[in-house]
């Protein structure tokens, strides 16, 4: 019952508060250095575009198909890191990416009932995420991870605010709790991935994106009693 942009707004509002607190505690620059503004803005813009396009794809495709398209982002990260960050990738890493993508397909089991516009949105979402993650790696020694998360969060909050004001639904206590919980767990993920790209190569970190599928299976079993089939276990 909660509109899309309201969910995105709350998700990033929680991250904004946490990042601001950490910045004040560490005395890191709130908006970063002037010379890095373009990279920070680009990272925030591509990150937000990836989220919105992903939500659009999910709304118009089967969940399996939209998830499959989203899992192409590590491939985009690898390509862009090689081209723009001059990171080297060996044959084993390339094989590893395609093996894990194949395993993801076994778990997701896409139906390939793809409509053209939502499919393009899903593909662009993966590309936007790939660019955003590559920019995270570029900023690794230039800005604090707290500053990067704050910048992304405040841009996302400001960009989604007009849509929220236009179509705001007052959440009940349960919905508010779920929105805040979503924001909290998303914040943990956002800080985790930002620190990961700070300390390791983009080509090495990106493949761990597929671990979300494993956690999804485990959580689905614990909370919703979903039993994975043989293909999912094989994947």
List the predicted regions and their residue ranges:
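Membrane-interface interhelical linkers
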Residues: 16-42, 91, 141-143, 154, ...
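C-terminal-most transmembrane helix of multi-pass membrane proteins
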Residues: 214-235
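Cytoplasmic-side transmembrane-helix entry/capping segments in multi-pass membrane proteins
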Residues: 34-45, 89-101, 118-123, 142-154, ...
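Transmembrane alpha-helical segments that form core, pore/gating elements
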Residues: 1-4, 19, 112-169
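Structural signature of hydrophobic alpha-helical transmembrane segments
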Residues: 3-15, 56-73, 115-128, 172-186, ...
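Hydrophobic transmembrane alpha-helices of multi-pass small-molecule transport proteins
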Residues: 92-108, 231-235
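Hydrophobic/small/kink-forming positions within alpha-helical transmembrane segments
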Residues: 20, 44-52, 74-79, 104, ...
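Helix-helix packing/entry segments at the starts of transmembrane helices
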Residues: 10, 67-72, 139, 143-155, ...
């Amino acid at each position: 019952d909660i509109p899309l942009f309201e969910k995105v707004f709350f998700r990033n509002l929680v991250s904004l508060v946490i990042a601001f607190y950490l910045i004040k505690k560490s005395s890191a620059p709130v908006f970063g250095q002037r010379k890095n503004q373009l990279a920070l803005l680009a990272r925030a813009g591509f990150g937000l575009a990836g989220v919105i396009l992903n939500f659009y794809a999910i709304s118009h495709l089967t969940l399996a198909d939209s998830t499959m398209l989203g899992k192409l982002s590590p491939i985009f990260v690898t390509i862009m890191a090689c081209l723009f960050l001059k990171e080297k990738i060996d044959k084993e890493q390339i094989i590893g990416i395609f093996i894990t993508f194949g395993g993801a397909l076994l778990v997701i089991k896409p139906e390939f009932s793809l409509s053209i516009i939502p499919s393009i949105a899903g593909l662009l979402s993966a590309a936007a995420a790939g660019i955003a993650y590559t920019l995270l790696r570029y900023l690794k020694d230039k800005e604090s991870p707290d500053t990067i998360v704050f910048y992304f969060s405040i841009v996302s909050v400001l960009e989604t605010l007009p849509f929220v004001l236009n179509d705001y639904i007052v959440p009940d206590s349960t919905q508010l709790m779920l929105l805040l919980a979503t924001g909290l767990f998303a914040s943990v993920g956002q800080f985790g991935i930002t620190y990961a790209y700070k300390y390791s190569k983009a080509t090495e970190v990106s493949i761990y994106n597929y671990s979300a599928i494993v956690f999804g299976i485990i959580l689905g079993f614990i909370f919703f009693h979903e039993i994975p089939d043989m293909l999912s276990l094989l994947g």
